């Protein structure tokens, strides 16, 4: 689940539900997993705050365990040494994008973690706004931006997962993939090929289909 699969990029809560489902298919039933699945399928946002509210409301032991695991994940992420850097071409591409467009970060991670990471690597100056898990789904985040007056034909979602493509499609905006394993080339293509097409109105459905096919080809499942 996740890194090199078709489910890459989904939230940790959605990942947990998928794991429970696959365990159940193998005859292993995790007690309380139905409480977690019910919350994930009905919550307006899959965030730490939303989970806390549901734990208090329901008193579910399974959700309380999910909360403990979620908090432990957050602590470990905060404690990670900054050993990884942005892929080659990211900073330059974001700089180029920001000279001609507003840039928003749309993520399933929590906003404080995103802001900290972008600041650490000197990328924060290239983003105008951050939409984290607190805002809701990625599709909701894009919809919020469109509600501010942006034209869908002038908006592009950049991401490395099918969930990003689906969020873009749900709002009628273009999508450019960052192909896992080919990140540097993908960022260069965004800057040199995809962005000019968007700016000149030549980002065709055929071009979009080609990009989506390329992303599907590098993911399994």
PLM-predicted stretches and their roles:
Residues 1-109, 206:
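Alpha-helical substrate-recognition element adjacent to the catalytic core
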Residues 82-102, 109-221:
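C-terminal cap/substrate-recognition subdomain and adjoining C-terminal extension
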